[in-house]
């Protein structure tokens, strides 16, 4: 017997009463959705918990209110079970006989009687009270995950609100994934057990951490090399003068990877790392809701533009993570992944780690580590790969335009 209630089909009634949502309406809904999903009452939405079930039920209710149709295996829900391996070096596997951790994807559909379908997704799970994925050092605390990823989940609902009222040349499948924090479990399960024919999928859009658009309006978009159609379209619809920072690879630490590995074009939208990432301080009041709406509107314009083109060609990309060096030490910083200047800019510093002990701060730009010149993230990682625990080296960084050097011990 299911421990969540099945949502009734009231979509047709809701649709009949709707009008095109205004910016004010959308911002109010974004705030409402993020505030609910990131509330303490949901206890961090960890997969397999009551908080995750409540979040899934909430998204099913939102989809129903908006007027999109259920497309799970049980109404809006697609339940899945993964078993955790006893060996930490082995991957989790789909469980049998109900053993393991059970989660649920929430899936809705807009059927425009089109030949092609666009998948739009965002994960709604988070870390619960922390665990191995947390960067928090201290007593156990609820990790509300407002940016990661209540922001993307709220954006998912906002796009459904916009697209349900417009007759487009594509169908739309909306998926709120669970189990992303555990290793893309929900999206992995979906692509192996799809509720539509994957041959009809044109491309997939993933929104993960889109709630912290900065003053420069910097928006990272990963996967632009997975179809030749993406880059021209992304530039064409950038009427808000967003500062786009792009990468080609379709592989990354979020749910778009599962679809890329099925030979589908993918895009991952991301407004950047911050010092609240995977910490209890990632709360709803820190979300830039106007910026979140800008991301939603931008994606809506992109979808409209790509709807004017034939089915997108898929291009395999070089896996940037495959070339990443292996390293056994850490500086203890959160890099600013949106920084496009020379060096590696620090977006956060972990307590009691080598960087903090050496005096480095948020905003410092690392330009040299040992004998290695740091020009970007890859050169920074290569430099780290040369060191072993216990070794010392000089680190050079820029602060307020001045070069500073310090001794760092790993």
Cite the ranges covered by each PLM segment:
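N-terminal capping segment at the start of a domain
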Residues: 24-54, 61, 65-74, 203, ...
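PDZ/PDZ-like groove recognition
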Residues: 317-362
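Alpha-helical metal-binding/catalytic segments enriched in His/Glu/Asp
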Residues: 108, 118-126, 130-184, 298-299
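Metal-dependent peptidase/peptidase-like ectodomains
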Residues: 115, 177-268, 288
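A non-catalytic alpha/beta surface segment that caps or lines the substrate-entry region
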Residues: 45-110
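His/Asp/Glu-rich mid-to-C-terminal helical/loop segments that flank catalytic regions of hydrolases
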Residues: 275-321
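PDZ-domain C-terminal substructure recognizer with occasional recognition of PDZ-binding tails
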Residues: 367, 382-410
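Conserved PDZ fold ligand-binding element
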Residues: 357-377
